[in-house]
């Protein structure tokens, strides 16, 4: 059974990201890689991975560059210290990459980013900074990054497992500008 992009009347539990009743305490988000049906196959995207993030999804890039379509972050006025929660993870039976199934095994990821939401050119002009789904492929390196909370040992588990990840500010060596922070000039995103 797969998720069909063309089936807008499909039940929500058939989507890659859905609400699920069997959380650690009540409901939870269920993220699952699904087949996309004939429309997805036609555009060379036969699967859709369940994901959840704070930010925006840019539909204009969804088919041509899906990682660029995920715009991470929302303005944030506080210095985050930890990312805490619970997860349960089971890797899929097959791993799809570059147009075919491979022998690789899927690995999940949980992380949060805190970054400068504006940059300035030599003329002093302000440009909004938007980090996207390419960040993990760049080893979480970007000139605007301030801190990262990254799960250190992602693994399969049959039972709910707690995570408590401190934000690493030393990695990027930047000081927080309290005035910019108070004005919401930093952005935060949590990505599953």
Residue ranges, per PLM feature:
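A short beta-strand element within beta-rich, extracytoplasmic domains
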Residues: 79-91
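Extended, low-complexity, turn-rich repeat/linker tracts enriched in Gly/Pro/Ser/Thr and Asp/Glu
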Residues: 89-97, 101-105, 118-121
